[in-house]
């Protein structure tokens, strides 16, 4: 598989008019393979294993929010990066998940070929299903290089997506609290 991938990179370099045998490009096919192996490592990770090993009994039934989770991913349409911050909240149902597992969950899905809308949905659904939460809210704010570097070339434009499940979808006060905590957080820095 690695050789096939590297051969494709060499072919691409030739097609754009480059010499894949020149000094600066000799190791590029291998470097690109390693980069994509890492950037798509989410396909080989198991969400259940990550979350189920970190579920703890708890009487807490208030919102848990992990905000400003930095991530990067690859747009499935152009294979160009998009990156930003995810804000993930849930309301426990007798169990809480270890806080470090929420950013890990974001990484699992971000390290795949993605569109932002799907990434947002996948994080929300995985948390809802695997933690048995009363509700989940996910907001992602991201910049897309396929928008900034090509096509419309609109630098610094931001796309925001949200996914709500359970009580976040059904209860207006819960939803308002979630969005309020995200917005107030932008003004507080440690």
Curated annotation (Swiss-Prot):
Family: Belongs to the GTP cyclohydrolase I family.
PROSITE patterns: GTP_CYCLOHYDROL_1_1
One GO MF term attached to the UniProt entry: GTP binding
EC number: 3.5.4.16
SUPFAM superfamilies: Tetrahydrobiopterin biosynthesis enzymes-like (SSF55620)
Enzymatic reactions: GTP + H2O = 7,8-dihydroneopterin 3'-triphosphate + formate + H(+)
Catalytic class of the enzyme: hydrolase
Subunit and partners: Toroid-shaped homodecamer, composed of two pentamers of five dimers.
A Pfam match: GTP_cyclohydroI
InterPro entries the record matches: GTP-CH-I_C/QueF (IPR043133), GTP-CH-I_N (IPR043134), GTP_CycHdrlase_I (IPR001474), GTP_CycHdrlase_I_CS (IPR018234), GTP_CycHdrlase_I_dom (IPR020602)
HAMAP family per the UniProt record, alphabetical: FolE
Transmembrane feature ranges: none
Chain residues that bind Zn(2+): 75, 78, 146
Annotated protein name in UniProt: GTP cyclohydrolase 1
Keywords: GTP-binding, Hydrolase, Metal-binding, Nucleotide-binding, One-carbon metabolism, Zinc
């Amino acid at each position: 598989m690695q050789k096939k991938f590297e051969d494709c990179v060499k072919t691409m370099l030739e097609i754009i008019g480059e010499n894949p045998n020149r000094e600066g490009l000799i190791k590029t096919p291998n470097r690109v393979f390693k980069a994509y192996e890492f950037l798509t490592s989410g396909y080989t990770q198991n969400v259940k294993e990550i979350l189920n090993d970190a579920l703890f009994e708890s009487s807490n039934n208030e919102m848990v929010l992990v905000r400003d989770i930095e991530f990067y991913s690859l747009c499935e349409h152009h294979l160009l990066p998009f990156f930003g911050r995810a804000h993930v909240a849930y309301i426990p149902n007798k169990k809480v998940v270890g806080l470090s597992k929420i950013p890990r969950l974001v990484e699992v899905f971000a390290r795949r070929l993605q569109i932002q809308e799907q990434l947002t949905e996948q994080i929300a659904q995985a948390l809802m299903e695997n933690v048995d939460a009363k509700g989940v809210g996910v907001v992602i704010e991201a910049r897309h290089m396929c928008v900034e570097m090509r096509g419309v070339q609109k630098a610094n434009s931001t796309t925001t997506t949200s996914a709500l499940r359970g009580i976040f979808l059904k209860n207006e006060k819960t939803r308002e609290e979630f969005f309020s905590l995200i917005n107030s957080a932008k003004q507080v820095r440690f």
